Structure formats: C-alpha cells, structure tokens
Amino acid sequence: MDLHNIREDYSKQELSQAHCHADPIQQFEQWLEEAITAKANEPTAMNVATVLDGKPTSRIVLLKEVNPNGFVFFTNYQSRKGQAIEQNPYVALTFFWAELERSVRIEGRIEKISAEQSDNYFAGRPYTSRVGAWASNQSQVLSSKSELVAKAALIAAKHPLHVPRPPHWGGYIVLPERIEFWQGRPSRLHDRICYRLVEGAWHKERLSP
C-alpha cells in the first residue's frame, strides 16, 4: 500500500508563545474548550502510553477531569495498563484535535486518586457501566462473548439498584512535568510551545518543528 502522497497542509491558526498562558494547565483548558466548541470528534479522548517490562504500549482512554494538579482518568487497576503503571509510574498522554490542527503531549508521573474520589465518580456512572466494571476482567482472555454477557447478567441480578465500586477499579491522576502544544502550520513550519516543570515552576519555550 503506497501512502506517500497522503498529506495535509495545515493553515488554520498559529500559536504565539507570547499569547500562551503562563500555566500550561490553563492553556490546555482553553484548547480543550475550543475543541469542544468546534465539535471535535471525541475531544476528551487521549492516547495513554505506558511501559511494561521495558516495552511501550498505548491505548485510547477518556479524560474525565482536569484540575490544577493534573489530568484524571478511570480504569481497571488490574488491566494491562494498571500493571504497567504499578511497575513504572511514568506515562505520556497525547490529544489530537484534527478539526483544529492541534495536538497536546503530556509527560509525567501517575498515581491513584483517593478511594472517596473514585467512589464519587463511579456512583455517577450509568448503571450498565457500573455492572460492566464488575463483569470485565480487563485484558484477560475470554472463552467467548457469551461468557462476558452471562457474567454481567449475574451481577445485574445481584445488584438490581446499587452497584458498589469494585476495589480493583478507580481513578489515576497524571501529574505533568512536561506539556507540549502543537499547532499545524503551512510548509511543515509548525508551532511547538513546550512547558517544562523545573523546581516547581513552569518554563515555557518554543521548539523547532
């Protein structure tokens, strides 16, 4: 399959270092709001990259909260990503909003949020999603789809109203140490503004594309 001639020439906007917020979290929130306003497809979807036994893996996960400390998502702690995080608590996140010709890359340390925070989020999930969190042994081999459906039915019968949060399911927060904002530009002269956390303070700089 020849893909040599598939390319886009970006030209919608530019990114000025002077106009970027001093705090990259605020800059991210602005870009995320603009992606939502522009009706970007799945604006909160992000690639989460981890390393397990020295080998990188990645998957798409939905961002569920941004706060001054970092970026929060929820998952099964016993999943492959959970095992990787337990072994190596450093991850990378990537957002891509094609509609705005923008990308954000985030690198940092990851840790679990409190059980209370996970409980509060889990309680607000749809009933079927709460059942699914119990039914799925995420990343484990299934003999058939019917096995999963049957297990979900049993859990629903056991918990017809209130489904408690599984102890192996909850939230993580990524505490950023490096955040890069990328804006596509003509002739591949893209804008890249990078923030690095140095001794507790954010340093902002422009990178060559």
From Swiss-Prot:
<feature type="binding site">
    <location>
        <position position="125"/>
    </location>
    <ligand>
        <name>substrate</name>
    </ligand>
</feature>
<feature type="binding site">
    <location>
        <position position="81"/>
    </location>
    <ligand>
        <name>FMN</name>
    </ligand>
</feature>
<feature type="binding site">
    <location>
        <position position="121"/>
    </location>
    <ligand>
        <name>substrate</name>
    </ligand>
</feature>
<dbReference type="Pfam" id="PF01243">
    <property type="entry name" value="PNPOx_N"/>
</dbReference>
<dbReference type="Pfam" id="PF10590">
    <property type="entry name" value="PNP_phzG_C"/>
</dbReference>
<dbReference type="InterPro" id="IPR011576">
    <property type="entry name" value="Pyridox_Oxase_N"/>
</dbReference>
<comment type="similarity">
    <text>Belongs to the pyridoxamine 5'-phosphate oxidase family.</text>
</comment>
<feature type="binding site">
    <location>
        <begin position="188"/>
        <end position="190"/>
    </location>
    <ligand>
        <name>substrate</name>
    </ligand>
</feature>
<keyword id="KW-0664">Pyridoxine biosynthesis</keyword>
<comment type="function">
    <text>Catalyzes the oxidation of either pyridoxine 5'-phosphate (PNP) or pyridoxamine 5'-phosphate (PMP) into pyridoxal 5'-phosphate (PLP).</text>
</comment>
<feature type="binding site">
    <location>
        <begin position="7"/>
        <end position="10"/>
    </location>
    <ligand>
        <name>substrate</name>
    </ligand>
</feature>
<dbReference type="InterPro" id="IPR019576">
    <property type="entry name" value="Pyridoxamine_oxidase_dimer_C"/>
</dbReference>
<feature type="binding site">
    <location>
        <position position="182"/>
    </location>
    <ligand>
        <name>FMN</name>
    </ligand>
</feature>
<dbReference type="GO" id="GO:0008615">
    <property type="term" value="P:pyridoxine biosynthetic process"/>
</dbReference>
<keyword id="KW-0288">FMN</keyword>
<feature type="binding site">
    <location>
        <position position="64"/>
    </location>
    <ligand>
        <name>substrate</name>
    </ligand>
</feature>
<keyword id="KW-0560">Oxidoreductase</keyword>
<comment type="subunit">
    <text>Homodimer.</text>
</comment>
<feature type="binding site">
    <location>
        <position position="192"/>
    </location>
    <ligand>
        <name>FMN</name>
    </ligand>
</feature>
<comment type="pathway">
    <text>Cofactor metabolism; pyridoxal 5'-phosphate salvage; pyridoxal 5'-phosphate from pyridoxine 5'-phosphate: step 1/1.</text>
</comment>
<feature type="binding site">
    <location>
        <begin position="138"/>
        <end position="139"/>
    </location>
    <ligand>
        <name>FMN</name>
    </ligand>
</feature>
<dbReference type="GO" id="GO:0004733">
    <property type="term" value="F:pyridoxamine phosphate oxidase activity"/>
</dbReference>
<comment type="pathway">
    <text>Cofactor metabolism; pyridoxal 5'-phosphate salvage; pyridoxal 5'-phosphate from pyridoxamine 5'-phosphate: step 1/1.</text>
</comment>
<dbReference type="InterPro" id="IPR012349">
    <property type="entry name" value="Split_barrel_FMN-bd"/>
</dbReference>
<dbReference type="InterPro" id="IPR000659">
    <property type="entry name" value="Pyridox_Oxase"/>
</dbReference>
<feature type="binding site">
    <location>
        <position position="129"/>
    </location>
    <ligand>
        <name>substrate</name>
    </ligand>
</feature>
<feature type="binding site">
    <location>
        <begin position="74"/>
        <end position="75"/>
    </location>
    <ligand>
        <name>FMN</name>
    </ligand>
</feature>
<feature type="binding site">
    <location>
        <begin position="59"/>
        <end position="64"/>
    </location>
    <ligand>
        <name>FMN</name>
    </ligand>
</feature>
<protein>
    <recommendedName>
        <fullName>Pyridoxine/pyridoxamine 5'-phosphate oxidase</fullName>
        <ecNumber>1.4.3.5</ecNumber>
    </recommendedName>
</protein>
<dbReference type="GO" id="GO:0010181">
    <property type="term" value="F:FMN binding"/>
</dbReference>
<keyword id="KW-0285">Flavoprotein</keyword>
<dbReference type="InterPro" id="IPR019740">
    <property type="entry name" value="Pyridox_Oxase_CS"/>
</dbReference>
<feature type="binding site">
    <location>
        <position position="80"/>
    </location>
    <ligand>
        <name>FMN</name>
    </ligand>
</feature>
